[in-house]
């Protein structure tokens, strides 16, 4: 009985530390998302050369979020951030129809990596406020998300500048990371 109560207490009240890797093509909105969730406000961003790392507290989880630049010359460096990753946030510019195939290739390249085999996947279909943005269903189709088997994944429509959908995405991450560990 004591062990059960101890486990229940730890599950409900103890902070859990998790490592999140947030990637996507350049200008998808990764840094805007990171600081909107961290600070609750939109900050002026410049293209990320290298990475930003911040700790975000959400419910009972302390997320260490690594926001890695998405320019094509930087993408080969993503693999250096894979180790010990619990969750992958892949950010897509839903308005960028010309590069959605590039986004799909990068996402599938990553999920086939051995070091990321246990990471859960959250896709943020960002920039939903733009008039020609693809819906989450269309992004799901274009990224071939339904071909991802034996992996937990979820897609969330977002507008980083307004904060729409961000907390719902982190809520999904929290629920699934709590169940996984």
From Swiss-Prot:
Top-level taxonomic group: Eukaryota
Family matches, as Pfam families: Arf
Residues annotated to bind GTP: 27-32, 126-129, 160
N-myristoyl glycine: lipidated positions: 2
Region: Important for the stable binding to the membranes, residue numbers: 3-16
GO molecular function annotations of the record: GTP binding; GTPase activity
EC numbers: 3.6.5.2
Keyword Hydrolase tagged: yes
Family matches, as CDD domains: Arf1_5_like
One of the protein's GO biological processes: vesicle-mediated transport
The name this protein goes by in its record: ADP-ribosylation factor 1
Organism: Plasmodium falciparum (isolate 3D7)
Lineage, uppermost ranks: Eukaryota, Sar, Alveolata, Apicomplexa, Aconoidasida
